[in-house]
Amino acid sequence: MRTVLHALPAFSAGSSRQLRSLHFGLGHSGRKAYIQASLHADEVPAMLVAQHLKKRLEALEAEGLIEGEIVLVPMANPIGLAQDQQGSLFGRFDLTTGINFNRQYRHLTAALIPLVEPLLGADEAANTQIIRTASMRLLDGWQPTTEADSLKKLLQTLAMDADIVLDLHCDTQAVLHVYAGTPLVAQTMPLAAYLGAQALLVSKASGDDPFDESVSRIWWELAEHFAGRFPIANACFSSTVELRGEIEVDHALAAQDAQALINYLTHAGHIGGPVAPLPEALCAATPLEGVEPLTAPQAGILVFFKAPGDAVTAGEAIGEVIDPLTDQATLLIASVSGTLFARVSRRYVTRQMRVAKIAGSVAFRTGNLLSM
């Protein structure tokens, strides 16, 4: 294992931060998988899974079973990890800018088209390398003006040339679920099956440029743009993995999830040895555009009738909100049928606050599809 410490530019006198990446196998070998944990710094289950992954990858490297290079960033957000305010860790948003750490990465497609068009040809593998080189060139030219953007540039650069990118997160209260690009469904199904995911949410563009799409979306967009002229592969499979709820920090679960990720990487050819049998998938892929985010109709005490993982039928109440001043109770009614895969942990809510998400099978939403 090779450890690399990446210094972030100092934006305040007398302070410095760094990011640690762990490199297993052979770098610059032509094969690369990249895994990062806790980009939202308060999503601790991902960090524990990374600890278990590190031990497993060290053992596999000692056995000579790493095919190519696997890069692990066991804690992807030193900025957010330091944002402890009066006993609460604010790891989702940069307190300086108010921007989500998993939004506003560089969407490179438009800038790539004029760069690569004169260079592309009939060789798909050569085209992949041309596009990766040009992408790195564009990222190198990014001049961040905030500390958070410096971190985003570093993370996107580390992942940009990878064949597989896995971004490990968690929700507040949730079952394990997975996000991926619609063109990547076939590659995502084995990952979801090994992990035991209960929802797989797919979209070609979820909005606001999250990390996982910043490294994969260019491939299907360039393939569409140059269709009939140049062959372009979906050369990067990326996915966001939500490792249940935020308090599910447990060694048994973390070891289970780490093994599932090892099984997936073996299945994908990035780790040698026998391939674990593929479990039966617990869910089908459903459109992110079909997710219903239920909002509180009034402020008050939130009482759920349904738990994460429960099936919900359109027209069914999943909970109620009780106004403590008027005693008025208002039901939360689902308008779609599907799986309730996530809900908030707060039990006093404000009007129009998002409180739960249901994975429906029929697309009906447009625009920015992710939570803030």
Q: What are these model-predicted stretches?
A:
Residues M1-M372:
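Structured catalytic-domain cores with a bias toward divalent-metal coordination
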